[in-house]
Regions:
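The substrate-binding groove and active-site-proximal loops of carbohydrate-active enzymes
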Residues: 39-51, 84-97, 168-183, 200-209, ...
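Aromatic- and acidic-residue-enriched segments that line the glycan-binding/catalytic groove
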Residues: 6, 26, 30-34, 80-92, ...
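Active-site-proximal helices and loops of the catalytic beta/alpha 8
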Residues: 105-111, 123, 128-139, 188, ...
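Carbohydrate-binding surface patches
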Residues: 407-445
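C-terminal beta-strand-rich structural cap/linker in extracellular carbohydrate-active enzymes
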Residues: 464-485
Length: 485
């Protein structure tokens, strides 16, 4: 099979935006009953963020170094997260409607910023037209076989649901994806928005649709509409089944997330926030030192085809997890060290909105705070480090799609080489609170006597007789070394 993933994804820096919470434009008329922007988020309240607000902040994203946006759902819905879809062909009016998306796509593409949307195709909402028709017409509805109905009248609001729904939540009736009409409907959505100019789909809980043929056909239709479109699935477990070349290009790389949390967090994590996600998906994972982490991350690279590895969406938090800063009990040095790893490891890094300015938050809804646009509330050191790491990745092709090789993994120190052609970049990370002295074997990788420059701090080290000897690493710090020529 000729498996190819979009080249642009290999060089992407994603920025995940929760539309209700990122930015709002004064050009749109808003409902009166909105929560204040600055107040703590709630499960059901709206704050009024919209797509024109995002458009007005494209300068900010461009300055940060972002070249791809992943939006949480934007279609008409009766929930602030919009995973309860009413109409898949209409952008929610509160977000500015279809016209706002059209304008945003135009301006983003002018800046070479790609845009992918969240596709929720396993389930819809009680307000979805076809399901609502069943609520109104019962056994006489023309859409009975769009869902798995088990009794009448439907218990959509009271009592135990008598139809199949996601996580037994009556607000989320599951589609009958064995029905050809349902399949064709979903495929038409996928094609419609690709034709409208989006650059790909992030697929919500695609593992709930058990039929591989469904996603194979989905890929065929999307790639026919745009061969360069990106298809990325939300798969919080081993994704080999979906990454064989006939379904998805990549997945949200939660397997990497779990390892990053363990290695860089060490024994200093907030166990409640950490355990909320880990206990459900990676209870048996034990990473106690750099050796364990090296074996783990090398295994992830070997698990999938190389094309899929380059198209992974690598993240350390999202709308479904506590923010990593809060998992780390506010330790920003550990977060920045993890960021340096994320920006130098194979796969496309993804930043959850606000992480770059020090936004914190526990589990949902606190991980979905509104972005504070008063810069006095930002952490300038953190923002600067994010910008620097992004610039570093963009400036050095080896960090994006070069080969990866672990050179050192002992105790709390990890060192790995990224290489592409003549370019070789050595990354060394110290997660310890103590100064570390390490010797790294560089035999055959750089000439004897080569001078390597730290791209982060502009210091220099000299290779002697095949080794970088007595490399001194400050606590919770890293080096990115490249040979001077």
């Amino acid at each position: 099979m000729n498996f190819r993933t979009p080249e642009w994804v290999h060089h992407a820096i994603f920025y995940q935006i929760f539309p209700d919470r990122f930015a709002f434009s004064k050009k749109l008329v808003k409902p009166n009953n909105l929560e204040s922007w600055e107040s703590a988020p709630t499960n059901h309240g709206y704050k009024g963020g919209d797509l024109l607000g995002v458009l007005e902040k494209l300068d900010y994203l461009q300055d940060l170094g972002i070249n791809a946006i992943y939006f949480n759902p934007i279609f008409q819905s009766a929930s602030n997260h919009r995973y309860h879809t009413h109409d898949y062909f209409q952008v929610d009016p509160m977000l500015g409607g279809n016209q706002a998306l059209k304008e945003l796509l135009k301006e983003a593409h002018k800046r070479d910023i790609r845009v992918i949307l969240d596709g929720v195709f396993n389930h819809a909402s009680r307000g979805f037209f076809q399901f609502n028709d069943i609520l109104e017409n019962g056994e006489k509805s023309a859409y009975l076989d769009w869902f798995d109905i088990r009794g009448y009248p439907l218990n959509a609001y009271q009592g135990k649901p008598n139809y199949r729904c996601w996580w037994n939540l009556p607000a989320l009736p599951e589609f009958n994806n064995d029905n050809p009409q349902v399949r064709n409907f979903i495929f038409s959505i996928a094609k419609y928005w690709i034709d409208e100019g989006i650059d790909g789909w992030r697929l919500d809980v695609p593992y709930e649709i058990k039929d591989d043929e469904f996603w194979q056909k989905f890929r065929q239709i999307v790639k026919q509409a745009n061969p360069d479109a990106y298809i990325v699935g939300e798969i919080p477990m081993d994704a080999s089944r979906w990454l064989a070349g006939d379904q998805f290009d990549g997945v949200m790389n939660y397997l990497l997330t779990y390892g990053v949390w363990q290695f860089f967090g060490g024994n200093e994590v907030n166990t409640e926030l950490y355990g909320h996600w880990i206990n459900a998906h990676a209870r048996d994972l034990k990473i106690e030192n750099a050796q364990d982490f090296a074996v783990y991350i090398q295994g992830l690279l070997e698990k999938y085809p190389h094309e899929a590895v380059l198209a992974q969406m690598n993240l350390f938090d999202s709308h479904d997890t506590a923010r990593f800063l809060s998992i780390l009990n506010g330790n920003k040095d550990r977060l920045l060290l993890a960021l340096l790893f994320l920006m130098t490891y194979p796969g496309a890094p993804s930043i959850y909105y606000g992480d770059e300015i020090g936004l914190d938050g526990g589990i949902d809804p606190m991980c979905r705070k509104a972005f504070p646009w008063n810069s006095s509330e930002w952490d300038p050191q953190m923002l600067g480090f994010y910008q620097g790491c992004i610039s570093l990745r963009k400036a050095h092709p080896a960090l994006r799609d070069g080969e990866f090789k672990v050179l050192y993994a002992q105790g709390d120190v990890l060192g790995f080489l990224r290489s592409k052609g003549e370019e070789k970049v050595l990354v060394v990370l110290n997660r310890s609170r103590e100064i570390q002295h390490v010797d790294i074997d560089m035999q055959g990788m750089v000439p004897d006597g080569a001078v390597l420059r730290d791209l982060l701090a502009s210091g220099e080290v000299v290779e002697k007789e095949g080794f970088l000897k007595d490399l001194i690493l400050a606590p919770l710090s890293g080096m990115v070394l490249k040979e001077l020529k």
